[in-house]
Amino acid sequence: MEVLRRSSVFAAEIMDAFDRSPTDKELVAQAKALGREYVHARLLRAGLSWSAPERASPAPGGRLAEVCTVLLRLGDELEQIRPSVYRNVARQLHIPLQSEPVVTDAFLAVAGHIFSAGITWGKVVSLYSVAAGLAVDCVRQAQPAMVHALVDCLGEFVRKTLATWLRRRGGWTDVLKCVVSTDPGFRSHWLVATLCSFGRFLKAAFFLLLPER
């Protein structure tokens, strides 16, 4: 009961932060909460399950739920353009999933390249899709503990790289301004640009991860 009470209080604090200017700590907590929901949704879509301690609390509500819904819909658009890009991410990176440092280092390498030329919401969505793709790979290979590490790693990357950008835009709710097209024949320019670059990010990250000879 105490765990459930603390989880409920934590969830309430996260959602409350959407109603005012968030601190960096709150932005990171929100990033991780969104990451857990994003990963959970992608695992369900793949017919897989994962138990996150924080998910003992009620499903996100209010603005947090809206942000999560938009992130997932934008992620759907990204993945519909080229479905293979965000699948079998571990195989594309040529990494084993038994080592937490290898998995998190690979994720951070890809994340660093995604944002090497600046920050956009398209790239943020891509970051979440990469994390979810790796999470699916981990669960399929009986490494569910790696998912927790990925979510923590995502939060740390947001703290170091995205928090200032997010704060200047008033927080995660800024993504609600993004237009999600319901026309399957239309794809926003920023989505296409993100996808065109992502293959290069994977290749660059692969070479960064090669052992020194």
Curated annotation (Swiss-Prot):
BH4, short sequence motif: residues: 32-44
Motif (BH3): 67-83
Membrane topology value: Single-pass membrane protein
Motif BH1: positions: 113-132
Region Nuclear export signal: start-end pairs: 71-79
Membrane-spanning ranges: 190-210
Induction behaviour: Induced upon proteasome inhibition.
GO-annotated biological processes: cellular component disassembly involved in execution phase of apoptosis; intrinsic apoptotic signaling pathway by p53 class mediator; male gonad development; negative regulation of mitochondrial depolarization; negative regulation of mitochondrial outer membrane permeabilization involved in apoptotic signaling pathway; negative regulation of necroptotic process; negative regulation of neuron apoptotic process; neuron apoptotic process
Main location: mitochondrion
Phenotype upon changing residue 177 to R: Increases protein expression and stability. Increases apoptosis
Protein's cellular compartments: Mitochondrion membrane; Endoplasmic reticulum membrane; Mitochondrion inner membrane; Cytoplasm
GO cellular component terms, semicolon-separated: cis-Golgi network membrane; early endosome membrane; endoplasmic reticulum membrane; mitochondrial inner membrane; mitochondrial membrane; mitochondrial outer membrane; nuclear outer membrane; nucleus
Family: Belongs to the Bcl-2 family.
Further comment: 'Matador' means killer in Spanish.
PANTHER family in alphabetical order: BCL-2 RELATED (PTHR11256), BCL-2-RELATED OVARIAN KILLER PROTEIN (PTHR11256:SF48)
Subunit structure of this chain's protein: Monomer; positively regulates apoptotic process. Homodimer. Heterodimer. Oligomer; promoted by apoptotic stimuli and BH3-only proteins; mediates constitutive activation. Interacts (via BH4 domain) with ITPR1; enhances BOK expression and stabilization; limits apoptosis and prevents ubiquitination and then degradation; protects ITPR1 from proteolysis by CASP3 during apoptosis. Interacts with ITPR2 and ITPR3; binds most strongly to ITPR2, and barely to ITPR3; regulates their expression. Interacts with XPO1; translocates to the cytoplasm. Interacts with BNIP3; promotes oligomerization.
Purpose of the protein: Apoptosis regulator that functions through different apoptotic signaling pathways. Plays a roles as pro-apoptotic protein that positively regulates intrinsic apoptotic process in a BAX- and BAK1-dependent manner or in a BAX- and BAK1-independent manner. In response to endoplasmic reticulum stress promotes mitochondrial apoptosis through downstream BAX/BAK1 activation and positive regulation of PERK-mediated unfolded protein response.
Protein name in the entry: Bcl-2-related ovarian killer protein
Gene of this entry: Bok
